[in-house]
Amino acid sequence: MTRRRAERQPGWETRLYLIEYPPGAKGAPHLHPEPGVGWVVEGEFESAFAGQPVIKVKAGQSFVEQAGLAHLLFRNPSPDHPLRFVVAYTLRSVDEPFRLLP
């Protein structure tokens, strides 16, 4: 096996976010320009992309946020516990990891 540090790609960057949702909070419908890869630190969430079933992801589980599909549902279903997760995106330097849908 070989391992090398990836070379920097001009115009692109990788960002890591720690995101927190209070109990019962939900996100607005949005779109990801590039895929994201994440891991739930605490709590759980329910999520659905256009045309796909609702999934539930719990603490200790990983997930992928799909690019180019409307992310129609994202919520912390717990009335008592916060949700904390980390997610990484590799994006063009000028992009944000999501944009709200009208």
What label would you give each PLM region?
Residues 8-11, 31, 39, 56, ...:
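Extracellular/periplasmic catalytic domains that process cell-envelope and extracellular macromolecules
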Residues 94-102:
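Short, low-complexity, Pro/Ser/Thr/Gly-rich segments in the mature regions of secreted, periplasmic
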Residues 8-11, 21, 50-70:
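Short acidic-glycine-tyrosine-enriched beta hairpin
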Residues 1-28, 88:
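A short glycine-rich, His/Asp/Glu-containing loop-to-beta-strand
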Residues 29, 37-39, 62-65, 85-87:
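Structural recognition of the beta-strand scaffold that forms the well-ordered cores
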Residues 54, 68-95:
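Ligand-binding loop in jelly-roll beta-barrel domains
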